[in-house]
Amino acid sequence: MKHLLSTQDLSLHNAIRILDTAEEMSAVGDREVKKLPALRGRTVVNLFFEDSTRTRISFEAAAKRLSADVINFAAKGSSVSKGESLKDTAQTLSAMGADAVVIRHWASGAPHRLAATDWIDAGVINAGDGTHEHPTQALLDAFTMRRHWAKLSGTPSEGADLKGMRVAIAGDVLHSRVARSNVWLLRTLGAEVTLVAPPTLLPIGVEKWPCAVSYDLDETLARGVDAVMMLRVQGERMNASFFPSTREYSRRWGFDDNRLRALDSLGMKDTIIMHPGPMNRGLEISAAAADSPRSTVLAQVRNGVSVRMAALYLLLSGDTRETAAPPVLAAAGTAHSTKESI
């Protein structure tokens, strides 16, 4: 594939291909030497115009496990803070021979802009743009759900979709790029998605999204869910009051201890609790819920490296076959020079 900009761009075939490749990549983390020579000699640039810890480190770990060279670029303290444009920055990176650019930007659409221009001849991965999308987060979430879904059914996760899985995504949907990417990807994979939020934290036009909408978390849980994903309340993006108080928000839309107990009383022993991180403990999720056996928070972080390894590998390996993902662990020593669309 040439770029990874949006989950809306992914067909069912391509989404499963990335997830299946990630399954193979996950085996690398269990080896004594956690490295493959697949991208040796390639340069991956992490171009971050917004602060990030887990996403940047995850991409860095993914690239290094594939033996790529990594350049970390932060806007703070760089020429960008002195007024350098995205175009000038991209052309500078091109002159340095970047093969892939992982970009996080405060402006929605910035990764698409970079990919659509001739400023740089490199693959572009969207690591989060404004409130628009965060495709690799959605992919790692789907990877985590698919493993859980396969475990329950006693079948291999490779090649599987999420048909029939019921997923609730609750919280600050308005400011969440994670919610947007998850809605599109999960529907592509066959899951049934319900967004749960106060009316003030739902975007205009949400009724046109391929999902159901609810204002009541308890009612949604009572109808039955296989996974509930809590979204962080993004206070840094709020310039007005979107709910009466943090206490009221937690009581009505947070996953607190009472709702954790309710899963047991409702007979939902296999329901998992997810969070893309970072968490506001005590606000959208209680400490007990975050640390419970149902929580997949740490699994999501771990799976993120595998998914990002898969994305980088498919972006830079030049593999254009329309069949299932190749046996990466056996063939990872060969990485070609072309970058084509899937």
Curated annotation (Swiss-Prot):
Annotated residues for binding of L-aspartate: 82, 177, 232
A single cellular component GO annotation: cytosol
One of the protein's GO biological processes: 'de novo' UMP biosynthetic process
Keyword line: Pyrimidine biosynthesis, Transferase
Pathway participation: Pyrimidine metabolism; UMP biosynthesis via de novo pathway; (S)-dihydroorotate from bicarbonate: step 2/3
Listed GO MF terms: amino acid binding; aspartate carbamoyltransferase activity
InterPro entries named in the record: Asp/Orn_carbamoyltranf_P-bd, Asp/Orn_carbamoylTrfase, Asp/Orn_carbamoylTrfase_sf, Asp_carbamoyltransf, Asp_carbamoyltransf_Asp/Orn-bd
Keyword Transmembrane found: no
Reactions it catalyzes: carbamoyl phosphate + L-aspartate = N-carbamoyl-L-aspartate + phosphate + H(+)
Residues annotated to bind carbamoyl phosphate: 54-55, 104, 134, 137, 277-278
Domain of life: Bacteria
Record's keyword annotation contains Nucleotidyltransferase: no
SUPFAM superfamilies: Aspartate/ornithine carbamoyltransferase
EC number, as in UniProt: 2.1.3.2
UniProt xrefs under NCBIfam families: asp_carb_tr, PRK00856.1
Record note on quaternary structure: Heterododecamer (2C3:3R2) of six catalytic PyrB chains organized as two trimers (C3), and six regulatory PyrI chains organized as three dimers (R2).
Known function: Catalyzes the condensation of carbamoyl phosphate and aspartate to form carbamoyl aspartate and inorganic phosphate, the committed step in the de novo pyrimidine nucleotide biosynthesis pathway.
Similarity-based family: Belongs to the aspartate/ornithine carbamoyltransferase superfamily. ATCase family.
PANTHER family found in the cross-reference section: ASPARTATE CARBAMOYLTRANSFERASE (PTHR45753:SF6), ORNITHINE CARBAMOYLTRANSFERASE, MITOCHONDRIAL (PTHR45753)
Protein name, entry field: Aspartate carbamoyltransferase catalytic subunit
Organism: Pseudarthrobacter chlorophenolicus (strain ATCC 700700 / DSM 12829 / CIP 107037 / JCM 12360 / KCTC 9906 / NCIMB 13794 / A6)
Gene of this entry: pyrB
